[in-house]
């Protein structure tokens, strides 16, 4: 029996690769999950940041690793479900086994606190009445905020001009200076910047923001969220996957984990391995259609 016990997974530290810099949202969430799971697994979990090529470098480090459960990854949605429809990347969804989904944070349509609009309908009415007069910000052509805004305005029948920025901070600065009027980001930005939310880009309201209406309530079905799975290279043994899934689920149920997520204005959105894969595939298909529609000139 002792030989079997010695081989029991995990018997050495586990690495979680994050394809973005330390201190960013993905990194913080991965570290929280690593803390919680290491307690459940009674084993060290280390987060390794492998940055480059908009996430491709880190994700390739996961797909290139042995599928033994000792190399995992946490990534936001774009590199998995958006970038592959825009350019060649060295992986597909079939390159991974999904341990589970950590969270789903819908994007929010945001304007300056001083903006004249208090509802999405107010804003869209003005934008439709004055085509190409207003500007929306994005964190670059091809980013999730870019497609979210493009899709929203297309579905609402409004013509709004686009100004790309290098990231959230620059975009919100431009909103404060009224150089652009609208942007979309996740709930954390509501506290961080001088903005108000007009609508949640989802079909149902956020439990942390019960007073924020959804885009669906305005009749515009443009749904976008930032979501993160815990993934592994394809071919994870079933028992290893079960052990990891179990540890993940238990870690995410701990009050400490939930509280730490709430501090980032995020809510746990756990899905098990099977449901996570179905969710990611569905998002990918939807994004492919939107991208095709918007890229077709």
Identify the meaning behind each predicted range:
Residues 49, 74, 98-101, 138, ...:
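Structural signal for conserved beta-strand scaffold positions within catalytic alpha/beta enzyme cores
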Residues 118, 170, 210, 235-240, ...:
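Residue-level signal for the nucleotide or nucleotide-sugar donor/cofactor binding architecture
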Residues 68, 84-97, 158-159, 192-203, ...:
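Ligand-binding "clamshell"
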Residues 11-13, 154-160, 238-297:
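An extracytoplasmic/periplasmic, membrane-proximal ligand-sensing/linker region
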Residues 37, 64-70, 77, 84-166, ...:
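Hinge/capping helix and adjacent helix->loop/strand transition within the periplasmic-binding protein
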Residues 4-95, 132-133, 141, 145, ...:
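N-terminal (or domain-start) structured segment
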Residues 11, 64, 88, 125, ...:
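Phosphate-coordinating loops and pocket residues in cytosolic domains that bind phosphorylated ligands
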């Amino acid at each position: 029996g002792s030989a079997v016990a010695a081989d029991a997974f995990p018997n050495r530290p586990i690495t979680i690769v994050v394809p973005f810099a330390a201190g960013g949202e993905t990194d913080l969430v991965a570290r929280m999950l690593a803390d919680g799971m290491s307690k459940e697994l009674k084993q060290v979990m280390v987060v390794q940041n492998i940055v480059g090529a908009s996430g491709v470098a880190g994700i390739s480090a996961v797909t290139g690793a042995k599928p033994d459960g000792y190399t995992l990854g946490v990534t936001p949605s774009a590199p998995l479900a958006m970038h592959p429809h825009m350019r060649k990347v060295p992986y597909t969804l079939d390159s991974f086994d999904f341990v589970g989904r950590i969270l789903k944070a819908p994007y929010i349509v945001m304007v300056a606190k001083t903006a004249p609009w208090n509802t999405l309908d107010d804003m869209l009415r003005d934008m439709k009445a004055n085509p190409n007069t207003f500007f929306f910000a994005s964190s670059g052509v091809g980013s999730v905020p870019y497609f979210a805004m493009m899709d929203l305005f297309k579905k609402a029948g409004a013509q709004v001009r686009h100004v790309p920025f290098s990231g959230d901070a620059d975009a919100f600065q431009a909103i404060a200076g009224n150089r652009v009027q609208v942007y979309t980001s996740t709930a954390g930005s509501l506290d961080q910047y001088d903005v108000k939310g007009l609508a949640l880009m989802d079909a149902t309201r956020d439990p942390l923001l019960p007073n924020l209406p959804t885009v669906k309530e305005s009749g515009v079905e443009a749904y976008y969220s930032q979501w993160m799975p815990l993934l592994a290279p394809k071919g994870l043994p079933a028992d290893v996957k079960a052990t990891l899934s179990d540890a993940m689920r238990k870690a995410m149920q701990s009050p400490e984990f939930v509280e730490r997520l709430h501090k980032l204005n995020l809510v746990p959105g756990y899905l098990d391995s099977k449901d996570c894969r179905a969710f990611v595939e569905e998002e990918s298909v939807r994004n492919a259609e939107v991208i095709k529609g918007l890229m077709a000139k």
